[in-house]
C-alpha cells in the first residue's frame, strides 16, 4: 500500500484544508455536504465503505446522478462488488482525490459514516496486512469454545507485551492480537511502529462534525428510507448480486439489507420480513456508529443535523459563509 502525498499547489489556505462530515446512516450527511460543496466550490469525497461499490447505488443511498451533477463527487461507485476493498485501498484512493481537489483549488469535503476510514484519514493506518479468513475463523472458534482467558494465556506466551497491555476480559482485542501474531509472525507493537502517517493531520482540517440526530427520529428515518429504497429498485440490485454467486463474506454481500433480501429471493423470508430485518440491522449499526465515534474520535464536534449548516457557516471563514452553506 502506498499513500500519495497530497499536492497543495494552487489552493489557498482555506481551500487547502478539509471539512469532515460524519454521522450515523440516514442522518442527512450527503445533503449537508452537497450544500456546502455548492456554496464553497468544494469536492465531495466519499468516506463510506459501502458507497464505494457500484452495484449498490440504491441500497447504500449513494448520491443520485442529479446530485452528483451539482458538485464534483469522488470515490462513489468505483469498486466492483467482487472486490474486498480495504481501508488501505480507500486511503490510497482518498489521497488521490485530495490531491486533485487541492490542485483545482477546491475545498475537500470528506463525508460518510465509516469510522475506520475517518480514523485512517486523521490518525494514520496500521501496517498490519489483511488477516487470512481461515486464521480469523479459527481464532474466533477457539474463543467461543475455550473462552477469552485461554486465548489470553496463549497470547502471553507468544506476544507478552500485548497480553500485558490488554484486559483479559477484552474478547475482541485479545482475539485480534492473537490473529496478528499467528498470521504474520510479528507482534502488534512491531506493526504499529510501521504505521502510515495521517493523510490529514489536525492542522489541515478546517472542521470535523458528527451529525447526532435524536435516536427515535433517526430510527424512523431509517425505516422510511428502507421502504423508499425498495420502491426505487433495491431488490433488483440484490437480485443482480445474487445471480453472480459471489462469496457471501465479501463486504458488499454483507451490506445492510443484502443478506435478508437474498433470503427473500431464496424463498426463506417474505419481503416484509426481509425489510424488517434490514431495518433492524441498520438501526443497530447506527447505534454502534454513535458509540464508536464517541470513544474513537472524540475530536469531532457533535451537532444536531438541523444546526450543522449554521455551525459550519460559523466556523468556516470567508465571504462564502452565506445562507447557501446553511440549512434551508
From Swiss-Prot:
It comes from the Bacteria. One of its GO terms (molecular function) is tRNA dimethylallyltransferase activity. Residues 48-51 are annotated as: Interaction with substrate tRNA. The record marks 114, 136 as: Interaction with substrate tRNA. Pfam families: IPPT (PF01715). It catalyses: adenosine(37) in tRNA + dimethylallyl diphosphate = N(6)-dimethylallyladenosine(37) in tRNA + diphosphate. It is an enzyme of class 2 (transferase). Substrate binds at residues 25-30. Its cofactor is Mg(2+). The keyword Glycoprotein does not apply. ATP binds at residues 23-30. Belongs to the IPP transferase family. Catalyzes the transfer of a dimethylallyl group onto the adenine at position 37 in tRNAs that read codons beginning with uridine, leading to the formation of N6-(dimethylallyl)adenosine (i(6)A). HAMAP family: IPP_trans. Monomer. This is tRNA dimethylallyltransferase. It comes from Rhodopseudomonas palustris (strain BisA53). The lineage of its organism: Bacteria, Pseudomonadati, Pseudomonadota, Alphaproteobacteria, Hyphomicrobiales.
